[in-house]
Amino acid sequence: MAKYQCPDCQYIYDECKGEPHEGFQPNTNWGEIPEEWACPDCAVRDKIDFKMLADPRCEITQLKQNDPVIKQDNNIIEDTLSEPSILSAELEFTAEKISITDERENTPDNKVERRSQSQAVRRSSVKKIKNNKR
């Protein structure tokens, strides 16, 4: 899929991304865009004036159907797995587990208290100092 650039304002139409605001979904080929279409940024140039920049393959078309697809625009991660909710649940569980491990400390009476890492470090330092004085 190729990229096309407006010679006036440098707007780039990427076939992989499409132009949803103009009604062109991702993977819309340049040939599918009407001839009367004009640059959405400057409206000065018509489709025929655009210059082809490159012919890269979209990540979507190169990957197998069940491979996750990662788009780096705005740090958005999308995946094409048949069960994306399972992956999301696993990530949430892992993140929660890491968070709990980092933020919680067991007290002698088995109550769980939330502590920042700096509080935990200070408490452990105090314990070391007390043990060294004995």
Swiss-Prot record:
Pathway: Hydrocarbon metabolism; alkane degradation. CDD domains: rubredoxin. Fe cation binds at C6, C9, C39, C42. It is found in: Cytoplasm. Residues 99-116 have a biased composition (Basic and acidic residues). The keyword Transport applies. GO terms for cellular component: cytoplasm. It comes from the Bacteria. Residues 1-53 form the Rubredoxin-like domain. Pfam families: Rubredoxin. Residues 99-134 are annotated as: Disordered. Binds 1 Fe(3+) ions per subunit. Involved in the hydrocarbon hydroxylating system, which transfers electrons from NADH to rubredoxin reductase and then through rubredoxin to alkane 1 monooxygenase. Belongs to the rubredoxin family. This is Rubredoxin-2.
